[in-house]
Design a protein with these regions (language model features):
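Phosphate/pyrophosphate-binding catalytic cores of soluble transferases and nucleic-acid-acting enzymes
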Residues: 1-236
Length: 236
């Protein structure tokens, strides 16, 4: 999902200009970093593009994507309320002050079903659930009860690495290459843009979030971000 944001090139492994010339891509560089882009936005955009590409007699390929986006495009998505930068920032500030286990306990009082699914330190999903409740007065699980509708039929394929040690070695090499290519300079430029918000959805991307958080402590960045990449790859 980070591919949609302009300026997030190195950390998202965005296709190069030469690659884009060779194989047409869509939904690249369509948002500024301070503009939200949700799974619902992705389903709407991808569905439209699939129809347009098939109308031209071509076969669309949907490549990559987080688990949320992949599930949304395969199965459809619940109709969720839109995000609010103001409420999201307020929840993030409260979580930083109280600690996310305390926020998880608050969520358990208003939405036990959602809290049961989430770890006490899953600040992104806890924050989103609290944001939804504060905006609508309804728990997040209320919206999940609505049956989703598949977006369109599709064939799903995946590559599953057999050797986890080799995978971790490749992840470490990839992250080192990103640093060598100028990831920190890229993040510094993003932080200098007007309206930059460290709590925006764009800055939740693995690597970017850690670079912003630990920008003043570069000696910690490599180990922390590499660990995040490993856990993210394992989950995917």
């Amino acid at each position: 999902s980070a591919l949609v944001y302009r300026g997030m090139d190195i950390g998202s492994a965005k296709p190069t200009s030469a690659e884009l010339q060779t194989a047409p891509h869509h939904l690249i560089d369509i948002r500024a970093i301070n503009e939200p882009y949700s799974a619902a936005d992705f389903v709407a955009d991808a569905s439209r593009l699939v129809r347009e590409i098939r109308a031209r007699g071509r076969l669309p390929l949907i490549v990559g994507g987080t688990m949320l986006y992949a599930k949304a495009i395969r199965e459809g998505i619940d109709e969720m309320p839109s995000t609010s930068p103001e409420v999201r920032s307020a929840v993030a500030a409260e979580g930083a002050a109280k600690g996310w286990p305390a926020m998880h306990a608050e969520l358990a009082k208003i939405d036990p079903a959602a809290a049961e699914r989430l770890a006490p330190n899953d600040k992104q999903r806890i924050g989103r659930a609290l944001e939804v409740f504060r905006m609508t007065g309804k728990p997040l699980s209320h919206f999940h009860r609505k049956a989703p509708h598949p977006a369109f039929p599709m064939l799903t394929a995946a590559l599953v690495p057999e050797d986890r040690a080799a995978l971790h070695e490749r992840i470490e090499e990839r992250f080192d290459a990103m640093l060598a290519a100028g990831l920190l300079d890229e993040v510094r430029q993003l932080m200098a843009e007007p309206g930059f918000d460290a709590n925006s959805p764009a800055m939740r991307a693995v690597g970017y979030r850690q670079a912003v958080q630990f920008f003043g402590r570069p000696h910690e960045l490599c180990g922390i971000s590499f660990g995040r990449h490993r856990r993210y790859a394992s989950a995917r």
